């Protein structure tokens, strides 16, 4: 009999290790559901911000399961989603941020600083903005210290700036001021990375507006009974 290889298919059922099965089930349950039939999945709805425009039944199909999952997902499933891949990590970070599970602050901060995958940084920055404590400001500032000088990289600098400005607005602090000063690190990064005609859209006040919109929308959600 031919040897079964990990990841092979027998009767269309993947052969997995127990750990892989846990991750697969978590992805299927939390990452793949979609509120809109035209959507590629929850992760795509969160990434695109399309949910901000949802109305009526589509809005309910998006919000109710999302809020229920954010309040009920186990630590084991969150760890499974955070294990690898931008889609699961993005979704996990949103669930963490919605429920304000601050016990994951250090983990999300480490993932943000490592910047191993694309797109997931949106979720990390959203969650840290939702937490809005001095510790979150420190993490976001550390990210900007590391990546704003890297004008060869276009990662999550704008998202981190928006999140830090949002935290400042909540705490009455000015952690972002050194970065947003004229000629500061943020302006130099934007000037080096962004085309001149697009730079107004990356202004600090625009990044704050974008993050505030996400957090205000989340603040308006209620946990389903």
Which positions does each model-derived feature cover?
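N-terminal alpha-helical scaffold/docking segments in eukaryotic complex subunits
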Residues: 1-73, 181-225
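Structural detector for internal amphipathic alpha-helices that build alpha-solenoid repeat scaffolds
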Residues: 49, 53, 57-69, 90-100, ...
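Amphipathic alpha-helical scaffolding segments comprising HEAT/armadillo-like alpha-solenoid repeats
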Residues: 70-81, 101-113, 133-147, 169-180, ...
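Alpha-helix N-cap/helix-start positions at coil->helix boundaries
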Residues: 86-87, 117-119, 150-154
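Alpha-helical transmembrane segments with an aromatic anchor "belt"
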Residues: 95, 110-117
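Extended amphipathic alpha-helical repeat scaffolds
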Residues: 134, 144-145, 151-159, 163, ...
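A contiguous, mid-protein "functional segment" used to position or interact
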Residues: 160-190
């Amino acid at each position: 009999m031919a040897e079964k290889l990990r990841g092979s298919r027998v009767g269309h059922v993947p052969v997995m290790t127990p750990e892989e099965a846990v991750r697969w089930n978590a992805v299927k349950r939390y990452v793949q559901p979609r509120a809109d039939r035209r959507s590629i999945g929850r992760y795509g709805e969160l990434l695109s911000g399309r949910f901000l425009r949802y109305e009526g039944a589509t809005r309910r199909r998006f919000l109710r399961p999302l809020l229920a999952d954010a309040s009920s997902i186990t630590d084991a499933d969150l760890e499974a989603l955070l294990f690898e891949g931008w889609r699961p990590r993005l979704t996990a970070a949103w669930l963490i941020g919605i429920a304000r599970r601050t016990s994951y602050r250090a983990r999300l901060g480490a993932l943000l600083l490592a910047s191993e995958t694309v797109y997931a940084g949106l979720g990390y920055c959203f969650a840290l903005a939702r937490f809005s404590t001095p510790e979150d400001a420190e993490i976001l500032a550390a990210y900007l210290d590391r990546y704003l000088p890297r004008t060869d990289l276009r990662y999550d600098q704008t998202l981190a700036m928006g999140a830090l400005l949002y935290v400042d607005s909540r705490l009455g602090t000015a952690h972002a001021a050194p970065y947003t000063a004229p000629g500061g690190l943020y302006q130099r990064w934007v000037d080096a990375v962004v085309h001149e005609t697009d730079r107004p859209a990356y202004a600090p006040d625009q990044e704050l507006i974008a993050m505030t919109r996400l957090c205000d929308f989340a603040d308006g959600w209620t946990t389903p009974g």
